[in-house]
Amino acid sequence: KFAKELKSDRYNIPTYRTVLKADSEDNYALLPITVNPDGLSPDSIYMIPLRIKSISNYEINPDKQQVLYQVVLKNEYATMESTTHYQTAGTEIKHTTIGEKANGSNVTRVVAPISKNRVRVFVGTHTYTPGKVTKEDIDKYGMYLTINDDKSITITPCGSLQVEMIGGAEDNYYEVDKKGRQIFYLHYKYFDTNVTVTDDKNTWTEDCWITMEEKGIRSL
């Protein structure tokens, strides 16, 4: 996995001057950097290359003259500093050719920040390992959760996925409970391929719609 240099039009550094005080307990100084995260992928590593051009009074250590500043995507609901997981439990209903097949579902869901009020998750019981997810997987299984001002959630596909919300704000919303836990409540259906179906005698696969009703709690 390779890092990418963040294009200069995606960030702003108002001043390149900083002061490291002689009596400071810290051995570093800070620069203000503003980044526009819209359109950046949570699956990529972005770097801003910086170099000390000149200093006063002292000589520059050539071994410590350059730094790669890593941009970490983060919002209120997830961060890429470390992988964010929501422990999700609920009901899965497969709408098969032999009728509805209901099962309980439990999945540790990866939640990735996309913008200030949007995250990306995979539908159903599908999941992935950060750093190994493919564009094809995202296109097939990825959906966006947009958290609106009233804390209702709008569900949209990342790519070719067929997904539909069920109900309204009373079924799809975000809250922080009395214990301070962050929770997503979701109710939706999506179309999946090669779904395993079993009856009393046989097991086979078919394409069908699957309805999910779930509650996801952010793991600490």
Regions found by a protein language model. Give the residues of each.
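Intrinsically disordered, low-complexity regulatory regions in eukaryotic proteins
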Residues: 1-17, 28-220
